[in-house]
Amino acid sequence: MTEKIKTLRDSAGMRWTALLLLALAMFCSYVFMDILSPIKNLMESTRGWDSASFGRMQGAEVFLNVYVFFLIFAGIILDKMGVRFTAVLSGAVMLFGGCIKFYACSDAFIGTGLEAWFTNHLNWNGELPIIGPILPFAAGMPASAKLAALGFMFFGCGCEMAGITVSRGIVKWFKGRETALAMGSEMALARLGVATCMIFSPYFAKLGGEVHVDNAVKFGVVLLCVALIMFITYFFMDKKLDAETGEAEEKDDPFKSVDLGKIVTSLGFWLVALLCVLYYSAIFPFQKYAVNMLQCNLDLTPADPNTFWGGNSVTWVQYLIMLVVAAGSFSSNFIKNNKALKFGLMGIAVVALVVYCYMGFMRGTAETIFAVFPL
């Protein structure tokens, strides 16, 4: 006898389709998050950004979440409004911030009145001794960096809101089933966005033989549009699930200020929070500057543009091999009874990873070498 399917989440295919929608949205957001990291040197040469300006712009992503406590408000919104509303809202906020950042990096911004305003304002320096070092704006920053930081702040709000919303959505669809595997799979797919960014950001910035850094950001904005479409599709899919179950959208108990007291007095909360702080303080800042660090400390000789290793086609070949690594290692987790197939897939993934590393070495660029890191 076969199990009777009662609702969408009782179907493994529909459950994993919902997960794929959420994971792809996060994948797109992770691509945009580090879209300028592999082309920091190009931002310096074409837009006049120095390392301090670049660092403040990158740090702007978390400014509102951490120092204005927006992430706490995002959690309250999620509790009050539910997964569907918050998912679409987060996608829209990410896209809004991404568009601002794209405009800041584009040639259209140069010479405008808005550029003049940002040049003459937000030049904070020593007059704010306590919070000055953490502000996204400072004296000496190019106007494009200031506006990009403003857009990145909005993007960061949407991205972190999306992160907690996706986790909530996975629990809703996989509760009582393979929840841990689903969460791990979502995070694995999302993290591939970092490798995608490292490979394709320089590719689009240099496409056509000329440097146009806004093309790389445009690529990220297009993916943010895809992310919003994924969230909207999930919205209707999740709504259909609630119609089948005859329940209103699942929401938590109303927020009470006393809940914050219970949270901050929990030892488990602080252990998990400190673990996350250590992880994020080590990994994310490293990703922002890793490519430039390799460029400054390694004597790299890029391949001749007239050869295969220096051409555009190798970018796509290397990315396809990366997908083989990801697909082989990921699919092996689902093989339980056929050990030969399981180890065969793992072997293919290992061989593909070796080829991937070799291609990164032969291309001779810092971004292709660092692209191994997310895998």
Task: Give the residues covered by each predicted segment.
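Extracytoplasmic gate region of multi-pass secondary transporters
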Residues: 36-40, 266-329, 360
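Conserved MFS/SLC helix-loop-helix module at the cytosolic interface between two early adjacent transmembrane helices
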Residues: 68-125
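Symmetry-related core transmembrane helices of the 12-TM Major Facilitator Superfamily/SLC fold
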Residues: 214-234
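Central cavity-lining transmembrane alpha-helices of secondary-active solute carriers
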Residues: 59-76, 316-331
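Glycine-rich segments within core transmembrane alpha-helices of 12-TM secondary carriers
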Residues: 180-205
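Cytoplasmic helix-loop-helix junction between adjacent transmembrane helices
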Residues: 145, 151-189
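Juxtamembrane intracellular "pre-TM" segments in multi-pass secondary transporters
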Residues: 2-12, 242-273
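C-terminal transmembrane helical hairpin of 12-TM major facilitator-type secondary transporters
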Residues: 339-375
